[in-house]
Swiss-Prot record:
It comes from Dictyostelium discoideum (Social amoeba). GO terms for molecular function: DNA binding. Residues 42-76 form the SAP domain. The lineage of its organism: Eukaryota, Amoebozoa, Evosea, Eumycetozoa, Dictyostelia. Keywords: DNA-binding. InterPro entries: SAP_dom (IPR003034), UPF0746_actin_org (IPR051904). This is UPF0746 protein DDB_G0280809. The keyword Magnesium does not apply. The keyword Zinc does not apply.
Amino acid sequence: MISNKRKEIDTINEHHEKNNDDSDGIDNGLLTYKKFKKDFESGSTNYRELQIIAKSLGLASNGKKQLVYNRIEGYFLSKKVKNNLTNNETNRQVEKKKEQQQPQPQEKQYILTFKDVEPVEIYFWKIFRNIVIFKHIFSNFKSKQYSYYDLIGCDEILLNGKSNSMEIIIDNIKSYNHQIIRNESNIIDIINKFKKNDEKTRSFYNLLFSRYSSTSTSPSTQLPSTIQFDGNIDIWIQRMIENVNYTALDQFIKFFKIDSEVIKKAIKIHIDPSFFGNTTYDKLKIYNYLKSINSIPTSHTLLSTISINFSTLLSFDNKFKKLIKSYKRLIESTNLQEQQEQLEKQGIIKIHPNKKYYEKLNQKILELNEIQTSQFTNYQLNSTIKKLLNHTTPTSTSTSTSTSTSTYTSTSTSTSTSLKTTNLTIISTESNYSSTNNNNNNINLKEIIKKYYKSIYLFIYFTINSANKTIFRKPLLYYLYFKKERVDKMYEHVIKKWNGSNFDHKLFFQRIFKDIKIEKNEKFELISNVLNNKYVKTFKLKDLHIFFEAVFSSNDIELIDYFLKILKQQQLNQTPETTTFPVIGSLISDYCHFIDKKEILDFYFQNYRDECLLFNDQNQTWKRIQLGLIEHYEYLTGSIGNRCNFDIFRWFDSSKFLDRLNRTIAKPLLYYFDFRGTINFNFNFIFKGLIDSNTEDSKENSIIHFLSNAQLKHPLYVSPILESSFNRYKSKMLTFIKFLFNNISKESIETKLKVINLKTDNKNFEEINSEIVLTTTLTTTTTTTTTTTTGTTATATNLLSAKKGEDVGFFIIGQTESFNFTVSIRILLVCLYRLDRVDDIIYLFDKLPEVLFNPDYFSIFTKEHCLYGISSSYYLELFINYFIENLNNNTINYLYNCLCIASKKGYTQIFKNIISSDHNSKYLLKIRTKSNQSSLFSSKLLNDIVVKSINSLNFELSNLLIDFIDFSEKDKNTLKMKIIKSK
């Protein structure tokens, strides 16, 4: 065997000599990489043969077998890469000669030859290379118009409002556009946002550190000198720790190769010792990391300051794997076992006040050390603890659920439900289910979860002062899940141990009635005891609401039925000494918003129709029924000939108003409109509030649906409606704006603006005097806007009943061909801008300067949400140039306002372009004096422009303006000092 290998090796060497050692040995007769790898994996190549091959290739032959193999494999792969590069170049030259020799075809077909290209990418390149299609598609992108990146910078709105915010920042950094990150505050927001520990985030931070450091290769004219990570190492360590960002801290330390002593010093100076003591899951991760690189000062030892936030670290809503990690991080971070051993050696443990906790904890740690995470299935690790302990996926208990005793062990129980049962044992396969617990290899999962919780609680009891033990009371859920007592006994413990607070009452009843699997008879007994005043000394009247809510929200028909029957019996036997309970009809109506399935509605309809208000004629209760059940509710109510009452002034949940209003319009035979006593003036105010609440949920189609099927008697005042949508935190309402201005031309707007009343004697001119009425014409497409109300989609046309034309006060039911709306000039221009109709704006500027640049209107256009305030740098510069070209006593104010906005937003390039123009810079950015009357602005006005850039922390722009504008030395020094104080 070895002799054969030698022959193959000799052949390799000869081949290498002939080919300048550039071959990878793939040809016939050679020891090829493929054959070499196959022989090794099959076990036919022994250690001695590997050494011979390595020596023949000039490689080291010492070390373990796998190490020698890796060297040889690396040799083959490096040869292959080199040959591929050489061969590719040779092949390209050969192909080029062939192409020159052959006649060129008239039309060349491009074919992708890569084998690993995704199918979608192939389509992309086909489109990319088709000039006609490419231009059509990319003409829809309005990056110059919006340019939200330079408009808002890297603040919390960008970070939290855009799912691709990291990619946006990366693109801007790579293109050396540092407008996206203007100051250290932006970077702190980034550190607070991007914490995921994956390759993408790690690469992002490495890019960030490389560009914002003293060694950066970024052009000096672009890099903001105020941001350099390596200039304040200790401060950035502090910020990353306090923002609990493990990924940023880890990459920061590695990138700048920070010594552990430097980290210790930074922590000692800038981090309070109690910071890590107030333990959270992520803080433990950072603490253990710093401990692993020997960077925790002795003053910050965790054990001496530790306290635990039970509500987050040990929540039963956490995944099982998080509980395991929390336990390990807590035990590892404190060196608990080492400290225990030291105490034991010193004999201190014998007199330790918490000795009993130490012994129990030590036993639990030994038991948990025997358990490996690999023993659990992925399903178990990624399930919540509550879900695993409840045996079933949290859901409402159905009427067919068996009332046999529920089990807390892994023994499978037979129920008549089809609910998904989780595996409660550790098993050797990946199955999520188990039907037996007799196998010795199976371990009860509930007991393991309990051990983890128990160990953490014992750890706390062992490490804290005995006087503070009452602070670390085990949470109520731990008691409910792990104590094997009857429900009535559990409730007594709630009263005694947890003082029976409202929160504990609510938690107890919700878990007992809805989540925890307990024998149904015990739940019945608890209901009976509460209603029979067994707990009268502890159960207060204010707790009744909590109790009723828990019963009705369970959506368990058996439970609700039993509750209502006992309550009815109590009311029949009621005496002055007993608790007075609400009548059944009121209770059902008050808690009907908890109904989440049709069966509950049917139950009330069949058994309590006459007692409750739910199905009465012209009732208001229907508004509380969940939208997903409203169609079934309508069917039940209509089946007995009753109608629902729609009273706009008694509506309490405006976020659901439009969906319900559209239903009433669609089914006027089932709903009765009660708009009596209202006046038309109030409708705009009411409708604005309803629109505001619906824009947050992006329900613009609901708004359009209503306006398409209700003939308004008076123009709709849209300015305040759209005003609220211009807030950066809200939806832009582009769909609604397109709907309004769909068929309104610039000529029709011009006509309306011409007749506007420009005369006013009011010095404090109000915007209400600058409004116009426009008419929207609805097309067939518009009037059939789809809306989703009950889970099924239908068009507005199909939803309408045959009964149309009903006058309901504010409007007349029925499809409308057009409607009028009132809009202010300021909002009009903003809407045109949003619709990318800037050419129309310029058209109106040219046609109606006396209207749009009227001095009385100037205050309107200094607001934040005006045309110039929302413009991107591209369009703001366009407006600035327009005012320069059309300069007069009116436009000069608008020009100055735009320059102030550009300064505040840090649009540095606008000012660079002005400076580069000798003509513009002389009268825009030079001080107007007696000797220089060609300049437009005084020293104070130009000073204010600079101050706005300083206040916005745009120091690059500030320095640019200070250096160029001819301020006095005193004014320059004052401005520079202001920059220093702002840093």
